[in-house]
Regions:
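Cysteine-centered motifs
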Residues: 11-12
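Short, Lys/Arg-enriched N-terminal segments with co-localized hydrophobic residues
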Residues: 20-25, 31-41
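Solvent-exposed helix/loop surface patches that form functional interfaces
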Residues: 41-58, 63-64, 110-189
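Short N-terminal edge-element motif at the start of the domain
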Residues: 44-92
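Hydrophobic/aromatic-rich structural module bridging two neighboring secondary-structure elements via a short loop
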Residues: 78-126
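C-terminal structured interaction module
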Residues: 195-224
Length: 224
C-alpha cells in the first residue's frame, strides 16, 4: 500500500468490469497451481485497523502446493466512497506475483479486476499484454498493507541493504494500474523504511513478513 501513489506516472486503464450492483453476485476466487517448490506450510490470519481512514481488513496468508496466497476482505473508504473489497493474490515459491483477483463493491456498482503474470515481468489482463507494467514482479494493492509482504519476502534484505523496484500498483476504487517505483530499506530485522516518490513510512513486520505497524496507517490488532 502507498497513499496517493501513481500521481504523475504513466498508467494503463484497468481491465475492470463495472456493473450495476443489483445484477451481479460475488465472483468466486479459484485456486490454481504454481511452478516451483513450497516452503514451510503456513496459515496465518491477521486483522488490521487503519488509523488514517478507520478502515479494517481481515487477511489470511497461506501456503499453496507450490507458492503462497493472500486472501482478504477489507472495509474502507476510498475517495469518499465506502468500499467492500475481496481479493486474492497468488505468488510462486519465490514470492513473485502470478495471479490477482479483486472484487470491489460500491454503493451502486461493483468492479472486478483479474491479472496474471509469468513471474519474470510479463503481465496480462483478459489475454491482453500490459506493457506499462512490464518488468514488475510484485503487485501492490492501494488499500492494504498485505502486498508489502510480497517484496519483503521476495527481496530477503539484510539489515543495511536497500532495493529499488518497480511494482504494479492498483488504485481504488478505479482499479487503474500504475507502474510505481518503490524503495525498501531494511533498518533491522523486522523493520523497513518504505519510500515511493516523496512518500516515506516506517514498517514493522513479523517473522512471516506481515505488517504489524505501518507508520500513520495500519496496525495489527489481532493475529492467529
Amino acid at each position: 500500500m502507498r497513499k496517493g501513489a501513481g500521481r504523475g506516472s504513466p498508467c494503463c486503464p484497468a481491465r475492470a468490469q463495472l456493473r450495476g450492483k443489483e445484477s451481479e453476485e460475488m465472483i468466486p476466487l479459484e485456486r490454481s497451481g504454481r511452478p516451483g517448490s513450497n516452503e514451510t506450510m503456513m496459515n496465518m490470519t491477521i486483522l488490521w485497523h487503519d488509523r488514517d481512514t478507520l478502515g479494517a481488513e481481515r487477511c489470511t496468508l497461506s501456503s499453496l502446493q507450490s507458492g503462497f496466497r493472500l486472501a482478504s476482505t477489507a472495509l474502507c473508504p476510498a475517495d469518499g466512497v465506502p468500499l467492500q473489497v475481496a481479493y486474492t493474490v497468488d505468488v510462486d515459491a519465490d514470492w513473485c506475483t502470478r495471479h490477482v483477483v479483486v472484487h470491489v463493491e460500491m454503493p451502486h456498482a461493483v468492479a472486478d479486476l483479474a491479472l496474471s503474470a509469468d513471474g519474470a515481468g510479463a503481465w496480462w489482463s483478459q489475454d491482453e499484454a500490459l506493457s506499462s507494467i512490464a518488468g514488475c514482479l510484485d503487485v501492490d494493492l492501494g488499500i492494504t498493507p498485505a502486498t508489502n509482504t510480497l517484496p519483503i519476502r521476495r527481496l530477503r534484505l539484510q539489515p543495511g541493504a536497500v532495493a529499488t523496484i518497480g511494482v504494479a500498483w492498483v488504485a481504488f476504487p478505479s482499479l487503474r494500474i500504475v507502474r510505481s517505483e518503490q524503495q525498501y530499506e531494511c533498518l533491522a530485522v523486522g523493520q523497513y523504511r518504505f519510500r515511493s516518490g516523496t512518500y516515506s513510512a516506517h514498517l514493522v513486520v513479523d517473522a512471516e513478513g506481515l505488517v504489524q505497524d505501518y507508520e500513520g496507517a495500519w496496525r495489527a490488532i489481532a493475529q492467529g
